[in-house]
Amino acid sequence: MLESRDLTKKFGSKVAVNRMTLRLEPGHVYGMLGPNGSGKTTWMKMAAGLMKPTEGEVWFDGEKVGLNSRARVAYMSTEPYFYAWMTPALAGKYYRDFFRDFSMERFEKQLESMQLDKNMKITAMSTGMAAKLKIAITMARDADVWMLDEPFNGIDLLARDAIRDSILSSMREDKILLLSSHLVEEMEAIADQAVFIRQGNLIETRDVKEMLEAGTTLADRYREIYAGMEGA
């Protein structure tokens, strides 16, 4: 279980995340939703142990997030993090040297399912191809928690189905998968739990299936929560 307790992050006078208490349980796919600037990335970086909170704590399986727990979390950022001269094959070897839980076999299967050439130079890749490579690298780790920040950015509509299948094929009952996005329709197709964040505050966590059975789509609820907000 991954849990934040009154987690807060301030940048000067700006409060990016405000006293967020959130619990993520194994066996679930969480979709963290909110417009750009709502605090999704900041919360994820703190939960992954990559950013120090101003206040509050993050706990993972009964201990505070630190070096031990950080090794069990695979976080995919929105920023590119490959050397331009690399190919996917070289990038895989590079990550294998850094992470003991990285599987080249799993990585190559991810590349195949996403139709990526492992010998293609990264400099020759489109934005969408580079985005797919980031997902493949992250999901090739046998982590306890996967966090994918805006995984569908830059990926065309036709490629998203294959990417969803590739991501979900890695899920198991003992894993936690968290994806952040402002693409609501994509989250409805992949997440079973929806986490709504507005201006750094946790609004609610909802069961997606129960919402749909009650006649409310994620898009409906998104509009209700974020109507009138700039960038929503």
Predicted regions and their residues:
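The feature captures the beta-strand-to-loop junction immediately N-terminal to the Walker
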Residues: 33-35
